[in-house]
Amino acid sequence: MFDIQKETIEWAGRPLTIETGRVARQADGAVMVSYGETTVLATAVGVKQAKPGVDFFPLTVNYQEKYFAAGKIPGGFFKREGRPTDKETLTSRLIDRPIRPLFVKGFKNEVQVMLTVLSHDLENDPDIVGMIGASAALVLSGLPFMGPIGAARVGYKDGEYVINPPCDEMDDSELDLVVAGTQDAVMMVESEAKELSEEVMLGAVMAGHKAFQPVIDMIIKLAERAAKEPWDYAPADHSAEEAKVRDLIGDDLAAAYTIVDKTERYKAVGAAKDKAVEALLQTEERPDGIDMTTLKDVMKAVESSIVRGGIIKTGKRIDGRSLDQVRSIVSEAGILPRTHGSALFTRGETQALVVATLGTGEDEQFIDALTGTYKERFMLHYNFPPYSVGETSFRLAPGRREIGHGKLAWRAVKAVLPTKEDFPYTIRLVSEITESNGSSSMATVCGASLSMMDAGVPITRPVSGIAMGLIKDPEGIAVLSDILGDEDHLGDMDFKVAGTTEGVTSLQMDIKIAGIDEEIMKTALAQASGGRLHILEEMGKALGEARTELGEFAPRIETITIPTDKIRDVIGSGGKVIREIVETTGAKVDVNDDGVIKVSSSDGASIKAALDWIHGLTAEPEEGQIYKGKVVKVMDFGAFVNFFGPKDGLVHVSQLKAERVNHPSDVVKEGQEVYVKLLGFDDRGKVRLSMKIIDQETGEEIKKEQEDAE
């Protein structure tokens, strides 16, 4: 029944197995990939005919984690997997990015790649396993895919690169880098780092590229035995149409791309394209075989050729800048009066409004993952409203792109955050992209640094980010700093680098051609370093370091530690005591199992009141100290006084006054406030108090009477 084909290698100390022919046999390509005891099912299916009018490549990558893979049952009412988590969305994008450029140019049939995590050993991250599975499934499917690709994770510890480090070792690594590529070139890089040099980052990319070559070899060996017949697909030749369009509007497009203002440039480009549509589609002499979809492809090819050729020949960009020149920058901090911290970062026609909000432990985000439930104290949310590019849209919820850009900026600034012990606040950053013409994620990085410094978050150093581009033509190569939207759209690379004056904190690279080599990456990293440092200088004009005080409306947090056996006294039966503290003082109180209590409020008086209350509940009275108390009960032998939180003590009749007392009621009444001194404890641990050695008017000790009492 089954024609099972399998390849196994030892890879970074663990067995890697790719198997096909047993599961999902009706898919065009399907493999089960196992690394250690982590298993992912990868499938690829392509539609045989492209939909009419489609002018893009409809590739969808869906990565999904099944809770049963880690022996868990989903939470919530329905107890089943629901909408994709951020981890699933980010991994889907991670896998999409290196495979998309390797489909034959012009292929527009719908393709769906699905990766399902079936088993997770909590040691080997399934994202790398899924990427290898996607590559193998596509190669076996017969689809016009110019793979295979390989992928690897690279860590960095004690000056050494570590290939595919186990999940539990990543906290000790200075680097978390994922690299994917072909036998000859790198296709994709994604990373976060703890301020590492460009040389270390480049070395990690090349170490990963070398490490996954055996994976590519095993996919090729498997394909030799199990691959399906290649699809009969050849891209259409539109060279004649391109020549016609170039003759019609080539000069118009060239003139349009000399206009610096984005809006005016788009109007001129649109007018040129309308001219081509009218000339070729709205006349009786309409050329054979050309429709609107084809014409769009042809116009884009001509447009790309004109822009790219102009940059290579002249060394000047669309907006007149040189190759390594950064757009003009304006940085502003503290622009919103009631927020905890805010910044407006403008670079050319790209603008990010970033707002920082500080919270307490109650505001931490709970994340339910296959590896277990954990809390995240730092969040960064990126929003790209349609007005930022002068458009309208009905979809206002964050999409895959927004989640991905937010995570990129999150990685970039994470390395400079203070520890939880030094700064016990939850931090949420929100980036609203108010204008966009390229590199909005890197504008978010810059705005995030400024907004946190404005909020008084003691980050170690500011972080800046820059997006690099590439034009790679037979006539030459040009690496571009701080790319525009058009340069991203018509170029060959989107290479984002973020970091401080001390090193790189994040690097992300996407390639639209068949990969780039080490020399191009080296050039791009060096050029990006100069751009980043320039941006940091411009940011410093607004705010060079974190403010010494928190924002006026930010909560203050005070931390104290109590003995663990006193936690029950603070919480009370069913939470009665802690609720009373919160309701009465207005402060938030967070009690940890280890006895650490965090009291927070934007009002200092509320914090003090709550701390005093907690101190009264948990502290022990000190012998020899004077306390103000209240008489709670009068007996024949003395009076009981509540003097220290819930603690009562006895003032014996002989300690009420220096003179002889017939009955305690002659001296004190219930509810009366008195001053008492703690003399000590009797053999049974009972408190001994004295009133007669204290001046009841002033609360001061009477020396002579003290000597007589002792």
Swiss-Prot record:
The entry's keywords? Cytoplasm, Magnesium, Metal-binding, Nucleotidyltransferase, RNA-binding, Transferase
Pfam family of the protein (one): S1
- Domain annotation KH: ranges: 555-614
The family database entries (InterPro entries) matched by this protein are listed as: ExoRNase_PH_dom1 (IPR001247), ExoRNase_PH_dom2 (IPR015847), ExoRNase_PH_dom2_sf (IPR036345), KH_dom (IPR004087), KH_dom_type_1 (IPR004088), KH_dom_type_1_sf (IPR036612), NA-bd_OB-fold (IPR012340), PNPase (IPR012162)
Q: Which Gene3D superfamilies match?
A: GHMP Kinase, N-terminal domain, K Homology domain, type 1, Nucleic acid-binding proteins
Compartmental location: Cytoplasm
The cofactors it requires, by name, are:
Mg(2+)
Summarize where Mg(2+) binds, as residue positions: 488, 494
Query: What chemistry does it catalyse, as a reaction equation?
Result: RNA(n+1) + phosphate = RNA(n) + a ribonucleoside 5'-diphosphate
Q: Name one GO biological process term.
A: mRNA catabolic process
The EC number(s) this enzyme carries: 2.7.7.8
Q: Which residues form a coiled coil?
A: none
Task: Supply one GO CC term from the record.
Answer: cytosol
What is the documented function of this protein? Involved in mRNA degradation. Catalyzes the phosphorolysis of single-stranded polyribonucleotides processively in the 3'- to 5'-direction.
Q: What is this protein called?
A: Polyribonucleotide nucleotidyltransferase
Can you name the source organism?
Answer: Maricaulis maris (strain MCS10) (Caulobacter maris)
Gene name linked to the record:
pnp
